[in-house]
UniProtKB/Swiss-Prot annotation:
<comment type="subunit">
    <text>Part of the 30S ribosomal subunit. Contacts proteins S9 and S11.</text>
</comment>
<comment type="function">
    <text>One of the primary rRNA binding proteins, it binds directly to 16S rRNA where it nucleates assembly of the head domain of the 30S subunit. Is located at the subunit interface close to the decoding center, probably blocks exit of the E-site tRNA.</text>
</comment>
<protein>
    <recommendedName>
        <fullName>Small ribosomal subunit protein uS7</fullName>
    </recommendedName>
</protein>
<dbReference type="InterPro" id="IPR020606">
    <property type="entry name" value="Ribosomal_uS7_CS"/>
</dbReference>
<dbReference type="InterPro" id="IPR036823">
    <property type="entry name" value="Ribosomal_uS7_dom_sf"/>
</dbReference>
<dbReference type="GO" id="GO:0003735">
    <property type="term" value="F:structural constituent of ribosome"/>
</dbReference>
<dbReference type="InterPro" id="IPR000235">
    <property type="entry name" value="Ribosomal_uS7"/>
</dbReference>
<dbReference type="GO" id="GO:0015935">
    <property type="term" value="C:small ribosomal subunit"/>
</dbReference>
<keyword id="KW-0694">RNA-binding</keyword>
<keyword id="KW-0699">rRNA-binding</keyword>
<dbReference type="GO" id="GO:0019843">
    <property type="term" value="F:rRNA binding"/>
</dbReference>
<comment type="similarity">
    <text>Belongs to the universal ribosomal protein uS7 family.</text>
</comment>
<keyword id="KW-0689">Ribosomal protein</keyword>
<dbReference type="Pfam" id="PF00177">
    <property type="entry name" value="Ribosomal_S7"/>
</dbReference>
<keyword id="KW-0687">Ribonucleoprotein</keyword>
<dbReference type="GO" id="GO:0000049">
    <property type="term" value="F:tRNA binding"/>
</dbReference>
<dbReference type="InterPro" id="IPR005717">
    <property type="entry name" value="Ribosomal_uS7_bac/org-type"/>
</dbReference>
């Protein structure tokens, strides 16, 4: 953290095909080893496949999937008097998006389909229908926060 001034957050340019900042962020999450064009191909193919199967707009499917995966609460470890408590905390909107995207990509990578585009399309469709591994991850996080609600007064 700089001491002199607060550094502003860098503005992300919207993606070229759909002109969406959310999609540009998602492309950056998928990208590995700086291969952005490969990541774009994967995402566009996945969105096309999902759009054909569900006959909805590309961005509508992505937004619905993200909405069902974004966590509203999470637990953070807090040490109090020699013991560690899992304290439930609300998740800020930027982190909410980041976690949702990360969980979607992780779930897609673990799937069994042949190409990454098909895996991602399958996970996006599952998430938009409120099922799938990424949604299960969010439910687990929410369940953990609910179970540790008694420690909410340790929040900082």
């Amino acid at each position: 953290m700089p001491r002199r001034r607060v550094v502003g957050q860098r503005k992300i340019l919207p993606d070229p095909k759909f002109n969406s900042e959310l999609l540009a962020k998602f492309i950056n999450v998928i990208m590995q080893d700086g291969k952005k064009s490969t990541a774009e191909k994967i995402i566009y193919k996945a969105l096309d496949t999902a759009s054909e199967k569900k006959s909805e707009d590309h961005l509508v499917i992505l937004e619905a999937a993200l909405e069902n995966v974004r966590p509203s609460v999470e637990v953070k470890s807090r040490r109090v008097g020699g013991s560690t408590y899992q304290v439930p905390c609300e998740v800020r909107p930027v982190r909410r998006n980041a976690l949702g995207m990360r969980w979607l990509v992780e779930a897609a990578r673990k799937r069994g389909e042949k190409s990454m585009a098909l895996r991602l399309a399958g996970e996006l469709l599952d998430a938009s229908d409120n099922k799938g591994t990424a949604v299960k991850k969010r439910e687990d996080v929410h369940r953990m926060a609910e179970a540790n609600k008694a420690f909410a007064h340790y929040r900082w």
